[in-house]
């Protein structure tokens, strides 16, 4: 008598590209707890390896990856279903906009070659008349990723409210330490903040949308 062995469902594999940053640091453990197979990539492998003391990070495949070094992208993307793109080049100085576009083009090309099913990109909210080079670059980076053949879902988030968020902690320190402050005009600008926990929920859920769904 023959019997059919039970089918084994292999969980999807996600690459968190930019895993040493604020969002990546929080997203990796969340994906592991959701049952995903996770690979974390950053320019500095040592930074990621230092997290092995945390049992959650021991379940993560760690690799070095730099979108400005295309030769590192193939190994990082091999066998990946969903790739989270969380990097930028602001630390490079005045040329960061050009480098952001170059990095995005390299990543989109390598993701297509590796057979990645979807790229999830975390962008920023961009006002209609934006004069921030950083925000404009974030928008153009998403556009460049979409020029590739791999479907892209972009989440545009404002100030992220949570422990470790640079923008949030600057505001908190100002409020706690300065009873009176003369403020510049830009503090009157309206913004739509988002809690870190909510953003992580969205990042996980959009990766599970049907292939035909996507966009910004």
Summary of predicted features, one role per range:
Residues 6-36:
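N-terminal Rossmann NAD(P)H-binding glycine-rich loop of SDR-like oxidoreductase domains
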Residues 13, 81-82, 118:
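Structural motif
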Residues 46, 50, 54-114, 124-130:
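NAD(P)H-binding glycine-rich loop region in Rossmannoid oxidoreductase-like domains
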Residues 89-177:
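Glycine-/Pro-rich loop/turn segments that contact NAD(P) or position catalytic residues
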Residues 41, 86, 155:
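The conserved SAM/SAH-binding core of class I Rossmann-like methyltransferase domains
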Residues 103, 166-167, 186-208, 214-215:
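Substrate-positioning beta->alpha
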Residues 2-13, 202-216:
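Mid/C-terminal beta-alpha module of Rossmann-like enzyme folds, strongest
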Residues 36-43:
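Conserved glycine-rich Rossmann-like NAD(P)H-binding loop of the short-chain dehydrogenase/reductase
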